[in-house]
């Protein structure tokens, strides 16, 4: 069973407006006028979770544009649906970058000699170009998976007071480099890693956000002084059309405890985090999404750890769902089931984290063919820096075989 090909709800209305008013190109990046106004204790190397195993559980974004006298016609829509940007609906194919310096790409970590994007532009340009050459149309890039170093400034009370000296310029340089590489970006703001307790590692303080998320005033400071300036930095870039979506947080369920109010299994948090209840995380994500809506026209999603918690974010204002897949998840929520099989029919679904080497029961080519044929809206592998030549070649072969329906 396939989900509806068109985006629903808010995204459908935006897409309808784009179809009536927008103009778009047919390959590469979208026309600037349309896409530029779219509505769319861990170690230093950080934690990549995705272990949403266990039993229980169950089972496109849209874009808008300024008025134009030219009708918007998509001449190469994805088979079975996808993510809509401007007037183009494509299977959103890409790779997790996911970082060059964990928690240091945007702002840097001076004490560890970890520099931000601007200072390492040549390295990032090479990596982005490599992803594009391997068929990726989007790179999922982590921003603040932990808050440390110079990325965020705190006041004397320990509350977020603004972005660091180079954070804004690093964001804008990332967009410029994406333009040069002809690749689009999905910035992932936070991760469950942020919920590790505050600590000192090698003279560098890492600030855990559980106390910020659960206090209304401190949460407001985080959003007003960090989230909104990040979104504004994107919108002020001449290359803002390269920003296709915000992933608000990577695998939030791994920083949650207690029951789900929507009927999913109870949460099973990472043992090293300071977990919060569903209601507390949902409030944080709702507030963050509201701020992103106010200051950015990019699409919005939440990087759910697995189909185990398929209902977790169904009442939030996101444009499409993203879920993660690995061998443990696959034991209980097999990769070869459609979104509709898991009870998800209201919004597009992208698999935004799965091994570049594939699963024990399916190589990457088989995974991609399954998701493409069963109505998923996209697939973003983990991760470019982990991929070998054969895996990159397999992903490129998938794109070449499917053609323009998987290329933005």
Model-derived regions: residue spans:
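Aromatic-rich peripheral "rim/lid" segments of glycoside hydrolase catalytic domains that contact
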Residues: 362, 366-408
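Active-site mouth of glycoside hydrolases
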Residues: 75-318, 324-331, 345-347, 354, ...
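Ras-like small GTPase catalytic G-domain
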Residues: 341-342
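Sequence contexts marking disulfide-bonded cysteines in secreted/extracellular proteins
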Residues: 25, 71-77, 86-88, 403-405
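Active-site-adjacent beta->alpha loops and helix N-cap segments on the catalytic face
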Residues: 334-336
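Acidic-residue sensor for enzyme active/binding pockets
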Residues: 45, 55, 66, 247, ...
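Ser/Thr-rich, Pro/Gly/Ala-heavy low-complexity intrinsically disordered linkers and tails
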Residues: 1-8, 13-72
């Amino acid at each position: 069973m396939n989900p509806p090909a068109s985006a629903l709800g808010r995204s459908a209305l935006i897409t309808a407006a784009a179809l009536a008013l927008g103009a778009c190109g047919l390959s590469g990046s979208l026309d600037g006028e349309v896409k530029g106004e779219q509505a769319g204790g861990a170690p230093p190397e950080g934690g990549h979770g995705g272990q949403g195993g266990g039993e229980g559980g169950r089972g496109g974004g849209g874009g808008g544009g300024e008025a134009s006298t030219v009708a918007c016609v998509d001449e190469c829509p994805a088979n079975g649906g996808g993510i809509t940007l401007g007037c183009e609906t494509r299977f959103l194919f890409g790779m997790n970058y996911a970082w060059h310096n964990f928690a240091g790409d945007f702002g840097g970590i001076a004490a560890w000699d970890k520099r931000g994007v601007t200072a390492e532009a040549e390295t990032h340009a090479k990596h982005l170009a490599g992803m594009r050459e391997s068929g990726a149309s989007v790179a999922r890039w982590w921003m603040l998976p932990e808050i440390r170093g110079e990325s965020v400034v705190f006041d004397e009370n320990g509350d977020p007071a603004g972005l660091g000296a180079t954070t804004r310029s690093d964001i804008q340089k990332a967009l410029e480099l994406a333009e040069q590489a002809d690749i689009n970006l999905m910035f992932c703001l936070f991760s469950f890693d942020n919920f590790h307790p505050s600590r000192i590692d090698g003279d560098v303080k890492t600030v855990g956000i559980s106390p910020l998320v659960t206090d209304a005033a401190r949460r407001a400071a985080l959003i007003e002084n960090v989230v909104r300036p990040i979104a504004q930095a994107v919108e002020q870039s001449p290359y803002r059309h390269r920003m296709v979506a915000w992933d608000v947080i990577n695998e939030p369920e791994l920083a949650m405890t207690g029951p789900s109010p929507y009927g999913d299994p109870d949460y099973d948090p990472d043992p090293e985090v300071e977990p919060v209840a569903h209601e507390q995380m949902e409030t944080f994500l709702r507030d963050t999404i509201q701020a992103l809506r106010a200051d950015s026209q990019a699409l919005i999603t939440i990087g759910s750890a697995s189909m185990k918690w398929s209902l977790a974010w169904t009442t939030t204002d996101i444009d499409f769902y993203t879920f993660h897949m690995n061998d443990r998840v696959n034991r209980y929520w097999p990769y070869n089931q459609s979104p509709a099989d898991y009870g998800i029919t209201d919004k597009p679904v992208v698999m935004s984290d799965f091994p570049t080497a594939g699963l024990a029961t399916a190589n990457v080519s088989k995974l991609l063919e399954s998701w493409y044929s069963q109505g998923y809206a996209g697939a973003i592998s983990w991760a470019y820096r982990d991929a070998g030549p054969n895996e990159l070649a397999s992903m490129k072969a998938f794109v070449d075989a499917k053609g323009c329906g998987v290329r933005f």
